[in-house]
Swiss-Prot record:
It comes from the Eukaryota. PROSITE patterns: PATHOGENESIS_BETVI (PS00451). SUPFAM superfamilies: Bet v1-like. It comes from Petroselinum crispum (Parsley). This is Pathogenesis-related protein B. The gene is PCPR1-3.
Length: 155
C-alpha cells in the first residue's frame, strides 16, 4: 500500500472551540446550508455520532463525485481534534484504499485559532495519487473552512 500525505492550515478570528464545533461536530447539518452545492445530505448508517460512527454522504452537484462513506476515527473535544476516514465511494477513484482526514483547531493568543488539516491517501499497491487530486482535496478543505467560518462570524 502506498501512502501520500498533504497538509494545509489557515487562521481564523473565530475561537478554536466554536470553529471545532462548526467544522467537525455540527458539519452534517451546517454544510448543506452553507455550501449546498458541495453536500446534499449525510445519513448515519451506524453509531451515534461518536467514534466508530459510519456515515453515507451524498455529495452535491458542484462535486465531481456522488457519494462517500466516512467512518469517525477520533474525537477529542479537549484538544479540538477530529479524525475520520473515507472508506468507500467514487471519491476513492478505484485506486485509493482509504483517505484519512485529521483536523485540529489550535487556539491563538488573540482568541482566534489556526486550523490544521492533514490528509493521508492510502493507495492500492504502488498507485500514486496525481498532484491535481491532492490539490483538489486541499482546496475543498479550505473552501469548507472559509464557508463555515463566514457562517460562524455572521451568526
Amino acid at each position: 500500500m502506498g501512502v501520500q500525505k498533504s497538509e494545509v492550515e489557515a487562521t481564523s478570528s473565530v475561537s478554536a472551540e466554536k470553529l471545532f464545533k462548526g467544522l467537525c461536530l455540527d458539519i452534517d447539518t451546517l454544510l448543506p446550508r452553507v455550501l449546498p452545492g458541495a453536500i446534499k445530505s449525510s445519513e448515519t448508517l451506524e453509531g451515534d455520532g461518536g467514534v466508530g460512527t459510519v456515515k453515507l454522504v451524498h455529495l452535491g452537484d458542484a462535486s465531481p463525485f456522488k457519494t462517500m462513506k466516512q467512518k469517525v476515527d477520533a474525537i477529542d473535544k479537549a484538544t479540538f481534534t477530529y479524525s475520520y476516514s473515507i472508506i468507500d465511494g467514487d471519491i476513492l477513484l478505484g485506486f485509493i484504499e482509504s483517505i484519512n482526514n485529521h483536523f485540529t483547531a489550535v487556539p491563538n493568543a488573540d482568541g482566534g485559532c489556526t486550523v490544521k488539516s492533514t490528509i493521508i491517501f492510502n493507495t492500492k499497491g504502488d498507485a500514486v495519487v496525481p498532484e491535481e487530486n491532492i490539490k483538489f482535496a486541499n482546496d475543498q478543505n479550505l473552501t469548507i473552512f472559509k464557508a463555515v467560518e463566514a457562517y460562524l462570524i455572521a451568526n
